[in-house]
């Protein structure tokens, strides 16, 4: 039976058990930290902060590691350094974090430089050292998911031994609980709904940005959708190579249009689902041939997915960019 629940939990039937999701994630992060011999982790990227604290990063914070950050020390609850006085709201909205562990950040922005940046990174580091000393792990390696040259120099003066913290977090996040798997299915359902909506909306004469705007409006109407990074609309000559953007270009009859729901975020779970449409006309035999070829590549790679295989095994089902399109190397075909 397919999942019998929707976007929101209700009283009379089982939905996503968010308490179980939070506990599962924190256990996996702690296990990864221990497995890599770390005494603590400093997490500055949104996906890692979300994983260990289950708190929401505002959109304007997401590309600026350090405006808010989290510290996970061995044997203790996560510490959240929230941007400014937003912590007041975190204490109300996220009671699973102890009140005393919600603090204001000593806001840092990646790559900051200049005299004022040194004063700020000193405050940032002093608070971090206090957390490590309180937990008795000051002399243990600190895993970091981000670092820049100013932090490196200041950490060295403070006697902090830092190392890779992104790999442990990626290992933790790679395995999904049954609840998390259902979350991904819900995201897939939202993407299916958007693509069906586009079959009703697309028509010649619309511009790419009009189509993108409709997609944004449609997606943000779903409960739990907190961010839509992009709705890519590439039409006609923009469809190949797919320029992965949108513009004021007018869609003409019979053209191919690629629509990509790029990083729709529902309760922290993301998408990347794209489909190709022939708008206002019938696909040519050449278009059908390309479609059949691409569909074969896709199905062959899906069939290769099973426990124990590597991403290399899956990628081997796809063609060589050098042989197929004459590119210089595989990186030129990155999408």
Q: What is the predicted role of each segment?
A:
Residues 1-335:
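Active-site neighborhoods and metal-handling regions in enzymes and metal-associated proteins
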């Amino acid at each position: 039976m397919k999942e019998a629940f929707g976007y929101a939990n209700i009283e009379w039937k089982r939905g996503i058990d968010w308490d179980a999701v939070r506990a599962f994630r924190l256990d996996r992060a702690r296990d990864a930290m221990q497995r890599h011999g770390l005494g603590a982790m400093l997490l500055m990227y949104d996906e890692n902060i979300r994983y260990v604290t289950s708190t929401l990063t505002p959109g304007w914070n997401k590309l600026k590691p350090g405006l808010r950050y989290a510290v996970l020390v061995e044997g203790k609850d996560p510490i959240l350094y929230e941007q400014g006085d937003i912590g007041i709201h975190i204490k109300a909205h996220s009671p699973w974090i102890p009140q005393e562990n919600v603090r204001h950040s000593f806001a840092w922005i990646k790559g900051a430089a200049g005299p004022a940046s040194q004063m700020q990174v000193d405050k940032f580091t002093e608070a971090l050292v206090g957390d490590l000393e309180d937990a008795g792990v000051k002399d243990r390696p600190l895993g970091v998911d981000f670092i820049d040259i100013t932090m490196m120099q200041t950490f060295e003066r403070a006697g902090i031994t830092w190392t890779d913290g992104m790999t442990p977090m990626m290992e933790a996040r790679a395995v999904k609980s049954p609840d998390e798997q259902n979350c991904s299915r819900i995201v897939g359902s939202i993407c299916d709904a958007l693509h069906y909506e586009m079959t009703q909306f697309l028509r010649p004469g619309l511009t790419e940005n009009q189509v993108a705007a409709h997609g944004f409006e449609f997606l943000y109407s779903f409960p739990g959708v907190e961010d839509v990074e992009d709705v890519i609309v590439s039409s006609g000559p923009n469809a190949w190579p797919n320029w992965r953007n949108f513009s004021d270009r007018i869609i003409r009859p019979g053209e191919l249009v690629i629509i990509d729901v790029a990083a729709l975020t529902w309760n922290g779970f993301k998408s990347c689902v794209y489909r190709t449409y022939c708008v206002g006309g019938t696909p040519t035999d050449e278009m059908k041939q390309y479609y059949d070829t691409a569909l074969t590549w896709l199905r062959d790679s899906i069939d290769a997915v099973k426990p124990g295989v590597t991403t290399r095994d899956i990628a081997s089902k796809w063609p060589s960019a050098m042989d197929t399109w004459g590119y210089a190397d595989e990186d030129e075909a990155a999408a």
